[in-house]
Each structure stands twice: as C-alpha cells, then as structure tokens.
UniProtKB/Swiss-Prot annotation:
This is Patatin. Belongs to the patatin family. One of its GO terms (cellular component) is vacuole. The keyword Cytoplasm does not apply. GO terms for molecular function: monoacylglycerol lipase activity; nutrient reservoir activity; phospholipase activity. A motif (GXGXXG) lies at residues 36-41. The active site is at S77, D215. The keyword Kinase does not apply. Its EC number is 3.1.1.-. It is found in: Vacuole. Glycans are attached at N115.
C-alpha cells in the first residue's frame, strides 16, 4: 500500500510539472521502460529486437542501437538486466549487446540461472550462476559509464528504502556509482527466488557505503514506467541539451513501456472459499501474482490518463500481453519448451491491435515510434552541428 501511495504522489508531482504550452518543434525526451518478470523477459526482448531492426532500416545503419535513440532507459528485475545489456559499453564504447542478442542470452543462461538449489529453507535458487554470468558479461563497468541515462531500481532491506541507480544522481550521491553487475543482480534478487545481495562502494573522499539489496520490483512493483518518467523529467530540467524546453509538456515526451505479460484476463482466479484455506506461503505467492497484475494495470492507467489529458496519447505506447496461460505465466520456467512459447507470445503480440478501439497493431505502432525516434535523433544532430 505504501508503494502504491508513493507512486500516486510521484505521478501527480510529474503531472504538476507539465503545461499545456506547445512543444518546441522537434525537441523531445525519449524514454524506454522495461518491466520485471524473470524468464518472461523474453517477451520484451522480442519487441526490442523488432524495434532495433526498424531503427536500423529507417536510418540505413546496421550498427544502430537502442541506446543511440533513448534519453532514458529504465528497468526493474529482468528489465534491469535488459537495460544493462543495451547500455553497458564494450571496448569500442558501443553497447556490448544488440537487441537480437538478448533472446539467445536467455536460452543459453536461463536454465542455469533457474536451476533449483535443493534447499527447503532458503531461496529457491542460490543465485551463484546469475552473479557469475553478470560479472563475466558486464565486467567492472559502473553506472557513470552507461551509454545513456539509466534508471534501475532496487530495495535496501537494511535501510528499508528504495535505491535508484541513475547517472544523473551521481553528483549528489556518488556512492551510487556501483558496478553494473552488482546492480543487475540486486534488481533481480526477487524474495523467495534469489538471495539478497550485499556489496559496498567507495567514494573518492574515502567513504564506504554498504548495500543490502533485493528485487527492484519491491520498489516499483514490477513496472518502472513512472520511475523512468520521473528521471526523464529531471533530465529535461537539468540537461542543457533540453534548454529549449521551458516547462515539460507531454507533447515533448515519448514513452515506450514494455511488459513481460500478465494473466490479468484471469487465467488464475480464486474464490473467497478457496483463499480461506490458504496458509502464509500460499498467500505470499498469490499476493505477489495479484500485486504484479494490479500494479501493471494501474501504472498504465495513470500514465495513459495523463498523456490523453495533454492530447499526447500517441506519444505513449504500452506493449503488454494480458492473457498469458499455462507455463508462460511462470517467471522461473526456463525449460526450452516454455522459452519457445514465450518467443511465440512476443512474435504474436506484434500482430495484435494496440487496443480494442484502434486497428493499429503493435508492429505498426513500433514502426511509427521508430520513425519518431529517428527524426528526433537527426534533428538533434543537425542542431549540434550548427
């Protein structure tokens, strides 16, 4: 409940900063937000692969990457992992992973990450392989080296406060310049599934800071879109590149929010009679499912309401499958058969209409977004050259 209240407060703070003034022609803050969901991250990975392919086609550049087009990329849990993969630089200062590399990553490493530890008292998985592969892939890279602004959430169980890792916060909170592999493990350390993560950072003045972190979904309830928007709002206010924006208007904001699928069409429903027989563990699992589904719906509702009120509904796109069934609803079923089903879910989702009231498919909407992202990037490059 407290998390929901904080979301509402943040939402209305963002709303209060907007105005109905016309946007400066061509200037736009672009935001990508990716939900949590374990192995279901395959679904947004399919969407990202399609979008990056469209950007490469529109700009006739096979080396185009998502980080070249988005001012803010935010994620929680598996969405935080995707965020790191597409923003962490390689030795050539380019993203170490293209969008097309993400699904193969899940197929190669998912079965080892979600390999039952055998413990009946501790977490379902020991997390050792996950941490190992993150260290191998992300190396010693820290937040400040990300190729664009990031927003990755976690929750500190010692201070009982959310921890948000962003580049823009480092000047006032240098202790947050953590290694990306520590951040990625922390945001993915879902209670029950993985152990919490402890690490320390050291600032230039010799201070040491301790972190005891769990899944970012504890802080953002699975959907980090509001968090990503708040970071984008701050970026627009503080970054000289956006000096032409006097007061942020939603005509100047482009938000793409990717879900990992829900069963909110009620494949799993319960009656009061059934729930009356549940013990604490059964309630914990059910509450997690219910909370994730409800928060995903409500966050989308909050944001879409604001964009519509500002006559900017075409600047917000939520890509979500709301009718997962069977094994595809499970965040930790990394069997090859289930991962293949998740690929099919993502590919089928592209062909579905964005809403019941619109004939536009997600594929068509993403092509439209790719054109907007390309135009905005070219305009900014032209301004910079003059």
């Amino acid at each position: 409940m407290a998390t929901t209240k904080s979301f509402l407060i943040l939402f209305f703070m963002i709303l209060a900063t907007t105005s109905s003034t016309c946007a400066t022609l061509g200037e736009m803050v672009t935001v990508l937000s990716i939900d949590g969901g374990g192995i279901k991250g395959i679904i947004p990975a399919i969407i990202l692969e399609f979008l990056e392919g469209q950007l490469q086609e529109v700009d006739n550049n096979k080396d185009a990457r998502l980080a070249d087009y988005f001012d803010v990329i935010g994620g929680t849990s598996t969405g935080g992992l995707l965020t790191a993969m597409i923003t962490t630089p390689n030795e050539n200062n380019r993203p170490f992973a293209a969008a097309k590399d993400i699904v193969p990553f899940y197929f190669e490493h998912g079965p080892h990450i979600f390999n039952y530890s055998g413990s009946i008292f501790g977490p379902r998985y020991d997390g050792k392989y996950l941490l190992q592969v993150l260290q191998e892939k992300l190396g010693e890279t820290r937040v400040h080296q990300a190729l664009t602004e990031v927003a990755i959430s976690s929750f500190d169980i010692k201070t009982n406060k959310p921890v948000i890792f962003t580049k823009s916060n480092l000047a006032e909170s240098p202790q947050l310049d953590a290694k990306m592999y520590d951040i990625c493990y922390s945001t993915a350390a879902a209670p029950i599934y993985f152990p919490p993560h402890h690490f320390v950072t050291h600032t230039s003045n010799g201070a040491t800071y301790e972190f005891n972190l769990v899944d970012g979904a504890v802080a953002t309830v699975g959907d980090p879109a509001l968090l990503s928007l708040s970071v984008a709002t701050r970026l627009a206010q503080d970054d000289p590149a956006f000096s032409s924006i006097k007061s942020l208007d939603y005509k100047q904001m482009l938000l793409l929010s990717l879900g990992t699928g829900t069963n909110s069409e009620f494949d799993k429903t319960y009656t009061a009679e059934e729930a009356a027989k549940w013990g604490p563990l059964r309630w914990m699992l059910a509450i997690q499912q219910m909370t994730n589904a409800a928060s995903s719906y409500m966050t989308d509702y909050y944001i879409s309401t604001v964009f519509q009120a500002r006559h900017s509904q075409n600047n917000y796109l939520r890509v979500q499958e709301n009718a997962l069934t069977g094994t595809t609803t499970e965040m930790d079923d990394a069997s090859e058969a289930n991962m293949e089903l998740l690929v099919q879910v993502g590919e089928t989702l592209l062909k579905k209409p964005v809403s019941k009231d619109s004939p536009e498919t997600y594929e068509e909407a993403l092509k439209r977004f790719a054109k907007l992202l390309s135009d905005r990037k070219k305009l900014r490059a032209n301004k910079a050259s003059h």
